[in-house]
């Protein structure tokens, strides 16, 4: 019904994204976690508002270390050139009429230096913070609560 507010997330050609985990299970977890996070933020939309998001690229924080692939995958975070990035298109409708739309390029260059409210075991903690800031800047909506942590097989390793 048109009174229902919600977020619809579509991942366009995820196999072509700049940086995703190597394992297909982890890739699925990441996409599901991103979708769930956008849906949580969408709870702040006004009644009758629908937000359609098409994610066209994801570059996760850190870099996969291909030398350490095996039982334990490693994602190295050095904070130099490996900050999280995402590209998306969005369309906000009010009762079926488009009231805002655009393309957005999200990034957080100082992701390692900043306070982060998400759990340190959440594989998407840096991406969620970046999305929160974009959502607040674009729609004036702050997150209510936290989406559940996304757990992947990758171990984050911080290198200075």
Where are each of the predicted segments found?
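A short, structured loop/turn motif at beta-sheet edges
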Residues: 43-51, 91-101
């Amino acid at each position: 019904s048109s009174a229902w507010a919600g977020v619809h997330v579509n991942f366009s050609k995820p196999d072509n994204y700049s940086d995703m985990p190597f394992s297909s299970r982890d890739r699925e977890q990441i996409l599901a976690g991103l979708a769930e996070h956008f849906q949580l933020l969408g709870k702040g939309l006004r009644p009758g508002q629908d937000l359609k998001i098409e994610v066209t690229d994801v570059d996760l924080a850190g870099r996969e270390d291909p030398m350490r692939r095996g039982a334990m995958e490693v994602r190295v975070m050095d904070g130099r050139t490996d900050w999280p990035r995402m590209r998306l298109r969005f369309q906000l409708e009010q009762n079926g009429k488009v009231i805002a739309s655009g393309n957005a390029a999200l990034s957080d260059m100082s992701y390692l230096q900043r306070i982060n409210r998400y759990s340190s075991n959440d594989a998407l903690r840096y991406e969620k913070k970046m999305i929160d800031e974009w959502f607040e800047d674009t729609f004036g909506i702050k997150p209510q609560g936290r989406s559940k942590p996304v757990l992947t097989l990758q171990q984050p390793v911080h290198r200075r």
